[in-house]
Amino acid sequence: MADMSLTIITPERTVLRDAPADAVVVPVVDGSMGILKNHAPMVANLRIGVLRYKQDGVYKRVAVTGGFVEVSENRITVLADAAELAESIDVMRAMEAKRRAEARLRDRKANIDRTRAEAALRRAMVRLRAAGALDHDKD
């Protein structure tokens, strides 16, 4: 039986609603933070990364791209800019996005917005890590 519930909401949709969780690991701006039962109430900024939550002894992954996490009374609420469950990620599409971003960054002659290209590459890498197509321990 799970001790906590996890809800993940984006501006477009609710990704998870009251999903049972025994543990949650969120990517915050200064690293990763683990959340267990009876965690102190808090709010933290999220960074682009892989959120992991333990359900029935198995960790599940969600790609998140910034936002906030709130913990209160064994309820974890994530308000993310974007979020995608690992099983919903189109790996081929994410690989293509990674390839395009890398090509843009390699092209020294192109007049590109490096910040946007680097952000696109980070998003693609996180999606691939969440889907298990890349080493997800490097998040």
UniProtKB/Swiss-Prot annotation:
SUPFAM superfamilies named among the record's database cross-references: Epsilon subunit of F1F0-ATP synthase C-terminal domain (SSF46604), Epsilon subunit of F1F0-ATP synthase N-terminal domain (SSF51344)
Keywords associated with the record: ATP synthesis, Cell membrane, CF(1), Hydrogen ion transport, Ion transport, Membrane, Transport
Membrane-related topology note: Peripheral membrane protein
Compartment(s): Cell membrane
CDD domains: F1-ATPase_delta (cd12152)
Matches recorded under Pfam families: ATP-synt_DE, ATP-synt_DE_N
NCBIfam families tied to this protein: ATP_synt_epsi (TIGR01216), PRK00571.1-3 (NF001846), PRK13446.1 (NF009980)
PANTHER family (UniProt xref): ATP SYNTHASE DELTA/EPSILON CHAIN, ATP SYNTHASE EPSILON CHAIN, CHLOROPLASTIC
Quaternary context: F-type ATPases have 2 components, CF(1) - the catalytic core - and CF(0) - the membrane proton channel. CF(1) has five subunits: alpha(3), beta(3), gamma(1), delta(1), epsilon(1). CF(0) has three main subunits: a, b and c.
Name of the protein: ATP synthase epsilon chain
Naturally occurring in which organism (per UniProt): Symbiobacterium thermophilum (strain DSM 24528 / JCM 14929 / IAM 14863 / T)
Gene name as annotated: atpC
